[in-house]
A protein has these predicted regions:
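Conserved alpha/beta enzyme-core scaffold
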Residues: 1-168
Length: 168
């Protein structure tokens, strides 16, 4: 996705593992935002549940706070404005990270069977894989799973202890 024209905007917790996307952001070719990784993880769960967003104190009085930098990393993001909203909830200042539709979730699985069951036993971390897939599903988006050809197996051959989700 780190090619010009494939992305319009990105909201991420860090860019260290995506140097080409980082370059697009630095060259102001995409709107780039930086949000706390934990908030992004929780936001996927909120989107998956069909809720309006994440309400939290995390990010107040930091670069994410819309009264400061709003998490905006470049001019293109500043043109769009802050993604995060500051709100008053029960007399306390909070930040609201609104839900947005997930059009496509790109996921790698260790094994996938012919019915779409996905196992993740060889992945380095489970991280947010399931909530991302669920968020795309709830949004009416697509879940695209990559797997090595030799790891596309017959239905019933997966160890069910490692099946984490189903893609149909």
């Amino acid at each position: 996705l780190g090619e010009e024209g494939l992305l319009k905007k990105i909201i991420a917790g860090h860019y260290s593992l995506a140097p080409r996307i980082q370059k697009l952001a630095l060259e102001n070719k995409i709107a780039a935002y930086n949000m706390p990784q934990g908030c992004i993880s929780e936001l996927f769960r909120e989107i998956a549940a069909g809720r309006p967003g994440l309400l939290t104190h995390v990010g107040l009085n930091t670069f994410v706070d819309p009264d400061l930098e709003g998490g905006m990393l470049n001019d293109k993001a500043r043109e769009e404005g802050s993604y995060v909203k500051k709100v008053n909830f029960n007399g306390e200042e909070k930040l609201f990270y609104p839900s947005f539709p997930i059009d496509v979730a790109l996921i790698h699985a260790s094994y996938v069977d012919t019915q779409g069951n996905c196992s993740l036993e060889e992945e380095g971390t489970l991280a947010d894989i399931l909530p991302i897939a669920q968020a795309a599903y709830t949004s009416g988006g697509k879940v695209i799973v990559t797997v090595e050809k030799s790891h596309y197996v017959e239905y019933g051959s997966l160890d069910t202890r490692f099946v984490r989700f189903l893609v149909s």
